[in-house]
Every structure is written in structure tokens, then in C-alpha cells.
Amino acid sequence: MPARVKDRISLLGFGGAAIGNLYRAIPESMAFASVAAALAEGVLYMDTAPHYGFGLSEQRLGAALAELDPERRVVVSTKVGRRLEPRPDADLTRVRQGFVSPEPYESVFDYSYDAVMRSYEGSRARLRRDIDVLYVHDLGRRAHGERHPHLFAEFMDGGYKALRQLRDGGAVQAIGLGVNEWEVCEDALAHGDFDIMLLAGRYTLLEQTALTSFLPLCQQRKVGIVVGGPYNSGILAHDGRYGMRRQAPLMYEYQPAPPEIVARVAALEAVCQRHGVPLASAALQFPLAHPQVLSVIPGMGNPDEVRGAKEWLTLPIPATFWAELRAQGLVHPDAPLPETA
């Protein structure tokens, strides 16, 4: 991982899906205010993607940073692997591919060399600035099922060469994958040279299977990790000091949580109550104890969510809390914990 990027990435990052109108429309002013609040809280790493609102998130982030960050202190990452196809007949009032966007496009997976290059140029124009980190978006078997071997080969034979060319030529500083599954990151490291991985939802208080082989490999290869989805679709985004909460159903992986996950969250919350620790604080702080994790990037759709995340991240948590999680088997036995990090 290049030090010129690694040393500039803040522990708390800004996930840009919400300002691309994820599931619901938010006004331009709210998107701008969210970016401004993030900068005010010292957030100097911001992630987006063409898929987020079909270019809307990149446009909004670029416009805000052009005004708020003229010195270009912020490390910006975006993604390739989905090209934007015009859809002039699209119903702009409904949710399309998860977003309510005024942009008449849809995103189509394409991991070829030409598509990656075109995507990079489009993102650079929308962001109005150079791109620091470029991820390939949503490779993997979870995303593509039976098509995964074909698309992985398409990427390694085409899109990967484009990423290498952009990095080696100095157009971007670091390259990696932005995905929801660590297994494809491990496969990619067996076939190529990557600097950083954005892993969403796979190294959290609820899931630590990445510790078995992937994270040790990242340590060996000096690959940095950004943890997306630290709240696991929101099920961990709770105070937790005052008992179970929220309306049913609880959501996990964007669908109703299975009984074993609900039970695990209840066990975590019971420990939170005993130690006076917000569950969301533990969810944000836990991944950062691992030496390869550079940043956590929860979704931030308004200034209150930004300020809340910063408060949760910096709240002191007693060592006895982490010790009880370990003693109860609520975290992997090999997981680094903040009190020993």
C-alpha cells in the first residue's frame, strides 16, 4: 500500500451511496451538508461509485469538494466494473437498482479493458478531480453466481490491465477490489498485484471469517483494508445500552435477519448494557483493531449521521467490554481487539 495514500486515509471514512439517493431521494442541499459535516469532523477519506445514483453520488461529491476542499486533502476512491447505459425511457420517480435518481441510466456489469478506461474517465469528469484509489466493483460468486468465472477472467484479462496501466502511469495511486466477499479478493491476490481492498460487511462484530486466511494474506502482501458496511445493513447501528429496540423485522444483508443473527445481536447488546457501551461504537471500533484495516466507512446520509459516527468512533470503551466479548465467544478467538491493538 503506497504510503502517500495510506498515511492520508482517515480512520473514519464517508460512504457515498446515500448521497446518490440510495432507496430514497435526498435534496442537493442535504448531500452538500453531509460532505461539509464530514470534513468538519476530520473525515478525509470519501468513497463513491458510478453505480450510486448512476453518477449522481460522484457529481454531488465532486461539486461539494470543489468548493470545500480546494487543497485536495481528501482521499477520494471510486469504482469501475459497471458501465452507465442510457435509458431515456426510465421512470425516474421509482427505485431503480436500489436508487431514486434523476439520471436516465442503468448500470451494467462490464469488466473489460475499454469499459474500465471509459468508466475511469467518466468518474474523473463527474468528480472534477484526480482519483486517488480505484476499485473494481462487485466481482465474486455472491454477486454473479455461475457467471463469476467468466467475469473474473474478463477482468483479469482486460480490466485488471487497465487498472495496472492507470496506477503505473500515475493516474491513480492505488488499485483494488470493492466487494462484499473476501474470497474473490483472495483469488485476485493470487493472480495480480493490488494495494487495497474495500470489504463490505465481511469483517464486523457479526462476521470474522476473513481472519482464517484472507487477512493474514493481506498482512503478508501489505494490502490495506477499508471496511464498508460496519453496521451490517444497520442491525448494529444502535446504542445498545438500553435494551433491545427497533421495529421488526431487523435487517441483515438487506433482508430480514435470520434467528441466529438476531440472537447474536441480542447477546452483543446484553454485554453493551452491562458495560455502558453503545453497540454502534463497538461496531465501528472493532474492525480498526486489525493492523491491516485503515478505515471504516459507514453510510452517511445526513449531517447527524456523520456526527453520530464520529462520536461513536471516538467514545472510550473499557477493556473489560472487549474481554467479555472474547470470554463469551462473541468474537473470533484470533480477532485483534482494541485493548491489545
Task: Please give the residue ranges for each predicted region.
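Active-site mouth loops of central-metabolism enzymes
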Residues: 17-29, 101-117, 148
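Solvent-exposed, non-membrane alpha-helical residues enriched in polar/charged side chains
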Residues: 36, 62, 66, 117, ...
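Generic enzyme active-site microenvironment
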Residues: 45, 77, 130, 135-136
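Short glycine/proline-rich turn/loop motifs
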Residues: 15, 98-104, 139-144, 249
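Short, flexible, mixed-charge acidic loops at enzyme active sites
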Residues: 87-99, 238-246
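An active-site-proximal structural segment forming one wall of the substrate-binding cleft
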Residues: 110-130
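Beta/alpha (TIM)-barrel catalytic core signal, keyed to glycine-rich beta->alpha loops juxtaposed to Asp/Glu
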Residues: 30, 121, 125, 132, ...
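N-terminal binding-site loop/beta-alpha segment at the start of enzyme catalytic domains
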Residues: 1-80, 84-89, 93
